[in-house]
Amino acid sequence: MSARPLSVVIAAALGLSVGVATAAATKEQLQVGQQEYLAKCAPCHGPSGKGDGPQAASLKQKPSDLTTYARRNGGKLPEKQAWALIDGRQLDDRVQQDRAMPVWGHMYKTQARADERADIEPYVRARIAAVLEYLKTLQVK
């Protein structure tokens, strides 16, 4: 399946809104989320999400242990907060500049434009949603 139909399917399944989760992520969405996570998040957060990626040592601040994100928030992954951190576009400009984590919303938008996609914002939301769904699978009890 090409990336465009997949992004449309994922975005439609999520209702195109932040914080709206599907009852269960699709296998396809989890695969996309895993691919995105391993390519974009694992260099700092590590393949298992413990904050021990190969680039972690070169950062001023150690990356968060993503496996305990839900535990640190009362046992439930704070989806709106996680979405905002991953997307990053709604954060104050100074906050964006001070953080080591890329603003993935901008990065995905740039990627969509480079691919000459017509569905730029649905593509961005679908990618972030997929990463968020995969992040749920990394949580420890």
Task: Show which residues each predicted segment covers.
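N-terminal secretory signal peptides that target proteins for export/translocation
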Residues: 1-4
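Bacterial N-terminal signal peptides
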Residues: 8-17
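Electrostatic cytochrome c docking/interface patches
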Residues: 19-36, 74-75
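Stable alpha-helical elements in mature extracytoplasmic
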Residues: 29, 37, 78-81, 124-127, ...
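The canonical Cys-X-X-Cys-His
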Residues: 33, 37-47, 101, 131, ...
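Sec-exported extracytoplasmic/periplasmic mature domains
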Residues: 38, 42, 87-91, 136-140
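Short, non-ligating residues that shape and space the ligands of small metal-coordination modules
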Residues: 50-51
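Extracytoplasmic electron-transfer domains, predominantly the class I c-type cytochrome c fold
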Residues: 58-120, 131-135
